[in-house]
């Protein structure tokens, strides 16, 4: 059984856990004691059984361990007890008693364990029954310690009483005046309501009834007045309203409600009365503030109205609208009559005391109200004439202005301003010149400069207005300084009020000084004799009153413990405790002397605590007077600080105005320049983006021109190659017979090449005309292109000249070599070349027709492009003439405005020129295709078949002619170029013709 007697105690300041753990310890100890008793009985029958002895020893050791653990936990719990409260004191006494019992048990167990150890050593269970007084003496010491603790509790109680009294009085002093003012407002509201209802004569009856009700209960006069005013406003008579209010206040207190909880109850009940219906929300609010009252009210309503039982509950009846406010009023009357409303607790007594003091202050407050109101009215008059009190400040500003003029500060400022105006003028001039090129904008620049001058004039006018404002501030300060008499009157009244508070707090509640306070009220109204009234109050010795008060407290305690049931029960419990303690003390009287000494010391300490509490109480009174004076000084300090702060704020507003004005000017100018910068940047980007399609457009034009030229020369080469092939073919057939024909061929070829030259000249004239039209509009763009085209045509001319020279030399050689043969066949060849000439003539007509159509096409295209570009730039000129108006008018929309315009122009040019470009590219592709086909019709070269001609006699350098074994002919030529020709390039060209198989 001993093995099962272990446990754990877990205490974290939770009373329930602690008590449960102690129950577990007590249960374990009870089981162990029963086991020990059985072991002792067994050892009496078998004294030599050492096994039983060992079991008993282990059992006692376990009990000792549990006792020590319990004592430790009790000490820990004692250290957390607050002996300043009633519950804490009860708990402390209980824990101290338990700790003494546990310590006594532990001492006894230690003695028994030693006896068992001796029996085990001797081997025989033979223990004499004797009492160890050591543990008992320790118990007596513990008892003395507990009485010492009781003394500490008593001292703490008296100290707490003194501290609570001082705290209550101090806090009450702070709230009395505030409560009196609130009560005054509530009375004014009641009086106005009664006058409105035509019952003004009932004001004294209602107000005195509410004051009496507040004194007799824990209610606040303000709350009772407000509730009765609500009832009267809803149509109740004065008597009915008073009855309802009394019933509600008394019922709240009867069911345990405090004065603070009454506020919530009054609010909820007043809302239901005003709305004329009982809502669940208001009933819940009433119940939350006073649960007992809410429950009793619900049950009373159900009992007084049996018809409501059909709804089952108050909540259901309320939801159905079956409960009326009249039912609530009757139930509340019943509850209020049962409660009686008498003061029942110390807290209620304090509430009643505070309310009495607040009501006593009402006459004083009524007397002071007219004085303070007149002072406030005078201050209102100061406000109306404040504009006349600023002369001194205006004078100061004028003197300051004169000093600034004398020391040159204003002239420096003027120079700075002139410099700024000059800077603005220069900048605006630059902007005007920039925009002037767009037409019409320079006029707006002049208007902007005029705006800057207008701003400077406005600033000057504002400075004049500022002088008037400062003059008004000076008038106000002067008027304030002239009102010293009114301020002194206010000061005298406040001092009188302070003296009245001091006299009231010392005299009220201890002695009766009604006549003295009436004199005090009269003295305050007259403003004289304040200290005389105070001396009359203090004529009675306050220490005599103090003794009477202490005697009253003692008498009250005697009455409490002898006449009241609660006091009798407390005293009987205390007597029982003394009896139980005395039984232990009588048995062991050795410590009684020290006990009486401790009691006496406790009494002395208690008296000291009481005296210290009284000292603290009077110190609180002095501190209250100091606080009032501090409030007065704080009032005037705050007043002066407010005046100074107002002047500083006014001056800061003036300086802030000029600062904001200058910042506004800077922001406007910055915005203008930023907008213009964005405009120029956007315009530049627009030009780059807009004319990009034009570049592509003219690139396509020049590509077309190149294709046309390429087609022309392909045709020329084709004609030459075809003619040459025909000549070679004819020569192959009749070379032996028709040598004389070559003279005719020479003239025909000359005619052909003359036509070719005319064609090239016409083509060039057309190109020059096109180029001149383009160069007239974009001369700068075409200069670079013209150089390129010029070099290209120079190369083409050089090539044509060289080619013509070669052809001429070839034909010269041929005609010289075969002149006789050509003469013989001239008629035949003449017919052949006549047909060839007809073919060439027809071909040339077709070509000129094509180029005529091309020229007409380009003429129309350029006219359209010219009209489009002209229209665009005309629109741009119109836009530029109105640009400044747009800039000064709408800064926010200018970006999107230009974006839309430039985007539209760009899209227009993209669509128009893009289509033209595509058309030209298509034409170029068609011409290139024709050129490739024409070039493919007559593949060959001017040097084809030269291997069959012996050119050794021509002087052009055929130096070697040999035939290899495989019948291939190898010719070696010495090539000499014409004037301006590069021989190496010519040789490479001839070599390339051989490699390509065209020669």
From Swiss-Prot:
Domain of life per record: Viruses
Keywords assigned by UniProt, alphabetized: Viral release from host cell, Viral tail assembly, Virion
Gene Ontology process terms (BP): viral tail assembly
A cellular component term, taken from the record's GO annotations: virion component
InterPro entries: Tape_meas_N
Gene3D superfamilies from the UniProt entry: Apolipoprotein (1.20.120.20)
Compartments, record wording: Virion
TM segment ranges: none
Function text: Probable tape measure protein. Serves as a base for tail tube protein polymerization and acts as a template for tail length determination.
Family indicated by similarity: Belongs to the skunalikevirus tape measure protein family.
Protein name per Swiss-Prot or TrEMBL: Probable tape measure protein
């Amino acid at each position: 059984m001993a093995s099962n007697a272990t446990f754990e105690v877990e205490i974290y300041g939770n009373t329930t856990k602690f008590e449960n753990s102690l129950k577990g310890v007590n249960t374990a100890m009870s089981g162990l004691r029963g086991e020990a008793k059985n072991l002792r009985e067994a050892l009496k029958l078998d004294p030599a059984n050492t096994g039983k002895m060992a079991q008993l020893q282990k059992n006692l050791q376990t009990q000792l361990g549990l006792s020590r653990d319990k004592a430790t936990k009790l000490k820990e719990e004692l250290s957390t007890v607050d002996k300043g409260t009633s519950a804490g004191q009860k708990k402390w006494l209980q824990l101290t008693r338990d700790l003494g019992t546990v310590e006594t048990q532990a001492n006894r167990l230690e003695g028994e364990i030693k006896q068992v150890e001796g029996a085990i050593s001797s081997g025989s269970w033979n223990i004499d029954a004797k009492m160890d007084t050591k543990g008992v003496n320790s118990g007596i010491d513990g008892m003395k310690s507990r009485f010492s603790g009781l003394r500490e509790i008593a001292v703490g109680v008296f100290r707490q009483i003194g501290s609570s009294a001082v705290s209550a009085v101090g806090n009450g002093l702070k709230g009395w005046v505030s409560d009196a003012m609130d009560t005054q407002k509530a009375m004014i509201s009641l009086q106005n309501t009664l006058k409105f209802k035509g019952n003004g004569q009932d004001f004294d009856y209602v107000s005195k009834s509410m004051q009496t009700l507040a004194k007799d209960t824990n209610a606040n006069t303000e709350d009772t007045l407000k509730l009765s005013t609500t009832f009267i406003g809803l149509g109740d008579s004065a008597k009915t309203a008073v009855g309802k209010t009394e019933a509600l206040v008394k019922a709240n207190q009867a069911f345990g409600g405090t004065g603070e909880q009454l506020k919530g109850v009054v609010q909820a009940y007043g809302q239901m009365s005003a709305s004329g219906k009982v809502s669940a929300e208001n009933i819940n609010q009433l119940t939350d503030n006073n649960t007992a009252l809410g429950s009793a009210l619900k049950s009373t309503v159900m009992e007084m109205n049996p018809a409501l039982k059909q709804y089952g509950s108050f909540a259901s009846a309320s939801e159905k609208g079956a409960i009326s406010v009249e039912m609530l009023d009757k139930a509340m009357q019943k509850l209020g009559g049962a409660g009686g409303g008498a003061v029942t607790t110390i807290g209620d007594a304090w509430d009643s005391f505070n309310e009495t003091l607040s009501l006593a202050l009402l006459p004083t407050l009524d007397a002071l109200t007219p004085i303070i109101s007149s002072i406030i009215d005078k201050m209102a008059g100061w406000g109306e004439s404040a504009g006349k009190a600023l002369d001194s400040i205006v004078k100061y500003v004028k003197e300051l202005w004169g000093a600034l003029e004398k020391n040159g500060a204003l002239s420096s400022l003027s120079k700075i301003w002139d410099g700024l105006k000059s800077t603005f003028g220069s900048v605006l001039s630059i902007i005007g010149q920039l925009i002037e090129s767009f037409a019409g904008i320079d006029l707006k620049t002049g208007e902007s400069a005029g705006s800057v001058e207008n701003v400077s004039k406005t600033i000057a006018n504002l400075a004049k207005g500022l002088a008037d404002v400062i003059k008004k501030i000076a008038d106000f300060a002067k008027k304030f300084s002239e009102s010293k008499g009114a301020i002194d009157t206010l000061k005298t009244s406040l001092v009188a009020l302070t003296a009245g508070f001091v006299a009231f707090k010392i005299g009220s509640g201890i002695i009766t000084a009604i006549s003295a306070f009436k004199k005090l009220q009269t003295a305050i109204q007259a403003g004289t004799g304040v200290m005389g009234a105070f001396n009359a109050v203090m004529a009675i010795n306050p220490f005599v009153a103090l003794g009477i008060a202490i005697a009253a407290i003692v008498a009250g305690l005697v009455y409490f413990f002898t006449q009241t049931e609660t006091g009798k029960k407390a005293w009987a419990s205390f007597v029982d405790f003394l009896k139980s303690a005395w039984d232990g003390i009588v048995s062991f009287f050795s410590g009684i002397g020290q006990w009486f000494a401790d009691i006496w010391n406790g009494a002395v300490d208690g008296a000291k605590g009481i005296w210290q509490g009284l000292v603290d109480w009077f110190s609180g009174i002095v501190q209250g007077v100091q606080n009032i004076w501090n409030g007065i000084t704080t009032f005037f300090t705050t007043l002066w600080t407010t005046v100074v702060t107002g002047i500083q704020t006014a001056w800061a507003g003036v300086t802030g105005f000029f600062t904001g004005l200058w910042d506004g000017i800077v922001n406007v100018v910055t915005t203008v320049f930023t907008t213009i910068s964005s405009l120029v940047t956007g315009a530049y980007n627009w030009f780059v983006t807009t004319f990009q399609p034009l570049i592509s457009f003219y690139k396509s034009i020049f590509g077309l021109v190149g294709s046309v030229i390429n087609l022309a020369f392909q045709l020329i080469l084709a004609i030459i190659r075809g003619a040459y092939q025909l000549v070679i073919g004819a020569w192959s057939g009749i070379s032996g017979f028709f040598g004389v024909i070559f003279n005719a061929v020479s003239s025909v070829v000359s005619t052909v090449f003359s036509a070719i030259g005319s064609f090239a000249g016409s083509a060039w004239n057309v190109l020059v005309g096109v180029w001149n039209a383009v160069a007239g509009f974009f001369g700068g763009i075409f200069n670079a292109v013209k150089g390129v085209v010029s070099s290209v045509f120079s190369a083409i001319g050089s090539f044509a000249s060289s080619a013509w020279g070669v052809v001429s030399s070839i034909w010269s050689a041929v005609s010289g070599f075969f002149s006789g043969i050509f003469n013989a066949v001239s008629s035949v060849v003449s017919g052949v070349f006549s047909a060839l000439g007809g073919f060439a003539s027809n071909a040339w007509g077709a070509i000129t027709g094509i180029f005529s159509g091309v020229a007409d096409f380009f003429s129309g295209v350029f006219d359209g492009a010219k009209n489009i570009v002209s229209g665009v730039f005309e629109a741009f000129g119109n836009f530029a003439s109105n640009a400044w108006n747009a800039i000064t008018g709408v800064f926010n929309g200018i970006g999107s405005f230009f974006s839309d315009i430039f985007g539209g122009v760009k899209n227009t040019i993209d669509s128009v020129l893009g289509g033209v470009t595509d058309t030209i590219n298509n034409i170029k592709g068609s011409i290139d295709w024709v050129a490739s086909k024409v070039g493919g019709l007559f593949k060959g070269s001017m040097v084809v078949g030269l291997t069959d001609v012996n050119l050794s006699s021509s002087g052009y350098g055929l130096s070697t002619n040999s035939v290899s074994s495989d019948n291939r002919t190898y010719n070696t030529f010495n090539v000499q170029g014409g004037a301006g020709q590069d021989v190496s390039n010519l040789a490479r060209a001839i070599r390339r013709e051989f490699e390509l198989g065209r020669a």
